[in-house]
Amino acid sequence: MAGASFYSPLPCPFLRNFPFIMSSLHLARLLALAAIFIWASLAALGVKLAHLPPFLLVGLTLAVAGIASLPTRRSWRVPARTFALGTGGLFGYHFFLFLAFRNAPAIEANLINYLWPLLIVLLSPFLFPGLRLGLPHIMAGFAGFVGAALVVSKGRLAFEADYLLGYLAAVLAAFLWAGYSLATRKLPPFPTAAVGGFCLASGALSLLCHVLLEPLVIPAWGDVLWVLLLGLGPMGGAFFLWDLAMKLGDQREIGLLSFLTPLLSTLLLVVSGGGRLDQWTLLGGGLILGAALVGALAPPSRQTA
């Protein structure tokens, strides 16, 4: 309908009691920032479990997220296409990301992986005609990516043809996560609780990859607490917040906010004693904050048809 808002009203009347949550856009912004802050803790928490093989770690943490959400399992009954896309998005992203880390230097692979926020910004208008991609969004998107590149690479990059397979895997990971994120709103409506089913299925597939591709390892009892924290936080709970944010908000703005992830992750490592603050982090952080500010100040789009 002409002139109708592209965004939905608040999903719960109770939320109207909070004056700082005035619309679904405000709620989506808060949910996205919460997910981003939780994801930023992944590196600091992951250091505690660096001795575990990657697929084992992902499998265990996603399984924790799925098991924790079993009380909502009735909401997991979604169309097969939705379940396949949700599971494929979560599992496929981590599979190709680890394939990239195995076949390319970590800095370059991680940098390519951070194309996903830019892809969300650039692809949103093609999937959602009610969203317009203006020059400020494009410039902010590339500024955010450059900022993320500076934070991740510390000014040191060396792309070599020998690592082409790893680079391609990182590109696929970025496209998979951007595609999964955008599809949560493009698919027929499904409850956010269904993400628990996606996590459990993805965790099972990751554990299968551990059995087939990695040396078998039995975690120690001292690992249990950290696995639970990861599964309830950056490798679980954050996915639920992200799903709801993408359904309610402006995908362009959320994409720009996502560039905060590597910056916040670095700052948390600095605070926890696992990293140091340098000029690259400060310069990249300035670009990322500028990009996020553009996204937050840009006027919301309206559907024209």
What are these regions (language model features)?
Residues V78-R81, N110-N113, P129-L150, E160-Y167, ...:
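Loop-to-transmembrane alpha-helix entry segments
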Residues L49, L57, A100, F126-P129, ...:
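Hydrophobic/aromatic residues within transmembrane alpha-helices
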Residues L56-G59, A63, F98-R132, A173, ...:
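Specific alpha-helical transmembrane segments that line the substrate/conduction pathway
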Residues F6-L56, G88, F95, F142-V146, ...:
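Glycine-/small-residue-enriched transmembrane alpha-helix faces in small-molecule transporters
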